Structures are given as C-alpha cells and as structure tokens.
Amino acid sequence: MAKKGTKPDVATTFSLAGAVWTVEFVNHLDDMGKCDSEKQTISIRSGMNKQSTEQTFYHELVHAIMFTMGKLNHEEEFVDTFGAFLHQYHRTRVTHEA
C-alpha cells in the first residue's frame, strides 16, 4: 500500500505534453482548488486536511489534463469522479520491487 503519513502526497511540479506545471498552496483561495491553464499552475487552498488536499489535487489534475488535450468545457461531475478514482488508485496501489 501507499505510504500513510500526515502530509498530503501531491506533486510540486509535473509535466504534461512537455509543459511543466507547478502546484502551489495558497492561503486565501475562495475555492478548494484552481487550475490555470495559461500559467500551467494548480493552486490548492492551504490548511485543508490530507484527504481533502489530495482529492483536490487530483480533481485539478484532471482539469489540467483536459486543458492539455484541448478540451475547454469540463463537466464537473466527470472531473470530480475521475479525480476521485485517480486518488483512490494512488492511495491503494501496491508496488513491488523488480
């Protein structure tokens, strides 16, 4: 299983189609998260618990992927469900050393 700590397990940077995205934590953010496709930045509200922070990251990651695919209209129910499945995968994956 994935490591279980108290600190959220989210990327600080990642690449999609050759573009580097940055993840930042913001003290005063009205929403739980925000995906800015022009700045290639995901902002996450600071101070949330571990699970909310991770779920928000995966939700915003789905937005980032869709923007990268050229999709500008995102159905929130799809984004939320797909992000939750990615988070579940990440939290329950089992790795084996080769």
Protein language model annotation of sequence segments:
Residues 55-67:
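Active-site recognition of the HExxH zinc-binding catalytic motif
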Residues 3-52, 67-90:
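Active-site scaffold of zinc-dependent metalloenzymes
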Residues 1-2, 94-98:
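Short intrinsically disordered terminal tails
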